């Protein structure tokens, strides 16, 4: 599954190409580039899922957790470090399919829906950034890497909701979404730091559970703060106030944020975070 790295690199490349060189492109060219890249990403995601679920299961009948890529970015101690990589498990593989498929449909639909709109190239650049951020979030190998992509999701959603920046209501809606989710993300970050300090790891795979025993008394606080972050991203009460106003963005963006990807990011993070505590 060495090609899985391209699932992240291709939309990132699309964002850079459209963001930097989009003003010299026609609307048609920008749309074709963005849509074609997402089509390739979707094919790679389906290929990854096919290969993953076709592989032999473990002795207990479960699917293996794989890390095709994992490099240490910032080492702190022998056990505590910030790694960057790709983690594949049944949840992340299925989410790759969901995100790539829905995002591809949004790209295709937007080609006609946004025709003639000012900033067409910028729109497709932001879509590529949002998609890359969501894909990176679901395949993160640890909680801190998840947080990095988590913030990229917030930034890209702010840019998409406020796409019509000459419209005061759209600007207000984007600011509201950004501020509310940043408030929740602050709790998420504090929870991650407590989790890493007392647990001795940022990992959320089951084999790291033994490292948490020394900080068991602080674990509920860390998980509670991380839950606040998930609640904000998933628009749970009382941090739901930003979601209705997100309709100020282009309609395809609203579909992408409301129904498909961003609002499930919080739930997905809570599933991953709960894994080290199942003992």
Predicted segment positions?
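Short "domain-exit" segments at the C-terminal end of structured domains
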Residues: 275-279
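...captures the hydrophobic TM-helix bundle architecture rather than a specific catalytic motif
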Residues: 1-274
């Amino acid at each position: 599954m060495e090609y899985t790295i391209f699932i992240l690199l291709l939309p990132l490349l699309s964002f850079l190409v459209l963001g930097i060189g989009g003003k010299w492109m026609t609307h048609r060219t920008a749309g074709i580039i963005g849509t074609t890249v997402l089509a390739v990403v979707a094919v790679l995601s389906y290929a990854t899922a096919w290969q993953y679920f076709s592989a032999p299961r473990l002795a207990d009948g479960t699917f293996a957790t794989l890390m095709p890529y994992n490099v240490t970015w910032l080492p702190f101690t022998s056990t505590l470090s910030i790694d960057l990589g790709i983690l594949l498990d049944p949840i992340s593989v299925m989410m790759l399919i969901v995100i790539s498929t829905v995002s591809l449909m949004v790209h295709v639909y937007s080609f006609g829906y946004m025709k003639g709109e000012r900033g067409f190239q910028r729109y497709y650049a932001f879509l590529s950034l949002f998609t890359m951020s969501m894909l990176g979030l679901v395949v993160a190998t640890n909680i801190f890497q998840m947080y990095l992509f988590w913030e990229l999701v917030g930034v890209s959603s702010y840019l998409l909701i406020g796409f019509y920046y000459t419209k005061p209501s759209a600007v207000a809606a984007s600011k509201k979404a950004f501020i509310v989710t940043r408030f929740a993300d602050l709790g998420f970050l504090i929870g991650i730091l407590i989790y890493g300090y007392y647990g001795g790891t940022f990992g959320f795979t089951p084999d790291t559970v033994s490292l948490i025993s020394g900080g068991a008394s602080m674990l509920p606080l860390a998980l509670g703060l991380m839950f606040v972050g998930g609640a904000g991203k998933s628009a749970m009460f009382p941090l739901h106030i930003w979601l209705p106003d997100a309709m100020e963005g282009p309609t395809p963006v609203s579909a992408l944020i409301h129904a498909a990807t961003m609002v499930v990011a919080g739930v997905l993070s809570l599933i991953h975070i709960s894994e080290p505590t199942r003992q």
